[in-house]
Regions:
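Acetyl-CoA-dependent GNAT
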Residues: 1-48, 108-109
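Conserved GNAT acetyl-CoA-binding A-motif
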Residues: 73-87
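Active-site/acyl-donor-binding loops of N-acyltransferases
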Residues: 108-120
Length: 120
């Protein structure tokens, strides 16, 4: 597992890459200030861009990526993490999978996507 922490002007980004199982996930941890707006009203950071190559799916790779991302986010001070899910770009079993990982539906955003939050 390769983990990279990037320091941007308004946030820190965690990039987790599973080179063996061909997957990746990213976390954004906003720095204090005006950028930390209403998007982060329910959590300290956001997980996004979870992806595993199709031929490596359903083998635990995505779970390992998510767990690693959560651990790294916690190291940067996050106590909760959020992610978005929508039925246009993702199948219902993915929402159920997030819920099995401990994510709970918190709200629906202005784009119609569900906002899920987990305490870490």
């Amino acid at each position: 597992m390769m983990i990279q922490i990037q320091d941007w002007e308004l946030s820190q980004k965690i990039i987790v890459v599973d080179e063996i199982n061909h997957g990746t996930v990213q976390v954004e941890v906003p720095k204090p200030g005006p950028y930390k707006d209403e998007y982060y009203q329910f959590a300290d950071c956001a997980i996004y861009n979870l992806w595993v190559d199709e031929k490596y799916r359903k083998q635990g790779s995505a779970r390992l990526l998510m767990e690693t991302a959560e651990v790294e986010a916690k190291k940067l001070g996050c106590k909760s993490v959020q992610l978005e899910w929508d039925d246009k770009g993702s199948k219902p079993f993915v929402l159920e999978w997030y819920q099995r990982l401990g994510y709970r539906i918190k709200a629906r955003n202005e784009n119609g996507r569900l906002l899920l939050v987990k305490e870490i």
